[in-house]
Amino acid sequence: MFESHVFARSAAHSAVLYWDKPAAAKAGAQYTVYLDGQPAATCDRTHLTLTDLRNQADYRADVFFAGRCVGSCEFRTTPVKHRIDVTEAPFWAKGDGKTKNTAALQRAIDACGAGDAVYLPAGTYLTGALRLHSNMELYLDEGAVLQGTAEIVDYQPRIPSRFEGVEMRCYSSLLNLGTLDHTAGPNCENVVIRGKGVIASGGRELADKIIADEREHLKDYLAEHAALVAECENERTIPGRVRPRLINMSNCRNVWVHGLTLKNGASWNQHMIYSDNIITDHCRFISEGVWNGDGWDPDSSTNCTLFACEFSTGDDAVAIKSGKNPEGNQINRPSAHIYIFDCRSTAGHGICLGSEMSGGIEDVQIWDCDLTNSWSGIEIKGTPKRGGYVRGVTVRDCTAPRLMVHAVPYNNDGEPAPSQPVFSHMSFERLTLTGRGLRDGGFENVEPIEMAGFDAPGHELRDVTLDAVTVENETGTLTLPLQFCRGLTIRDLTCTARK
């Protein structure tokens, strides 16, 4: 029985291999990958890109660590796909950055079959919302920019969606996959979005327009519910919930996003709701300056994998969610089997689980991530109203400003769940916590570790292990703030004075 699962996503002449980190592997561990029995490469990360492969060919990959095979997989490269060039007949899209190409691009997408790929050559293609379908590929060549407008009308109609844990009608996203239905399985599957280009939307300008428009639309409601508004993070929270995402996936399965820059959604950049087997790798997420501008958000979704990505975001790089009280408890679809590795933050809040976690979050594994340049680092959070659970979390070989497991007071509006959340069964191994968070371009001292459960009996934070954790601060001494904890194990906790 192999120790690690090995997976492959392939194109016609290349494939990306990725695998679980073996339990004995530490930071910088070396792996040797064999292809059809011959050594292909040695690497110090749990993924490898293979090139110059034959199309429609079968391969076997074996991954060796410490002299033994820890996992293997077989994969087949795809046929060479027929290009549907959007700039050619009968579509005639113009990459001049001025012409609105929504209709032309949608026609190309609608014409794309399983053996085709919608192809965008270099250029800037201005567009409104687009709707993808099953069994298709969208490819952006180097220099290609799919640029969403900053005009509200281009993101009509509103569609069933979910935002901050509550189902509602939101503006269409730039790329829309699937139709939301929490009672059903996938209705959009086998989609590839890849290349070397950029997918960007209207960012802060579009967000501000939508918030202002929605605030006017809701002015009587907001005035009548001043207490509800006061419970929110700020006055933009309620009118901002209808903003589009950059890429929205509802009830999707088997989607691969690879190699792109994903930039300036009006809210979150990649949002997966009630979806399964979503793979995102070798992408850059950019949304600095966009309020609430998360990067990659699996929401009541399973088997989602993120690796080799860089984040410069206006909020969380990653936010794992599963609904908000009480609706999230009733729908009861957890986020589970989420794997995040070899990712780096240059700005933003870091990797977060919650706070919308009423449907549950479990089996989250994070390794080999550098979140030094973030504000929150690694954060697991909920509010007392949420209900639900977070359990089965493992974080290994990461650097971050801090580690927080705690309750938060914001985004706490709405009817409470019948009981408080339960946070349990977590392991944090070989972490470096710098005690310095990046905010607004500068570093500030922060508490490196915060551990707190909830005050109701049976809802304490429990069964948590800290092992080989190094903490840096000004003094070289550490007082751990612990509250409502049970079964906390600490091994090899070191505190050093910052030089």
Report residues per predicted region.
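Extracellular/periplasmic carbohydrate-active domains that bind, remodel
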Residues: 1-499
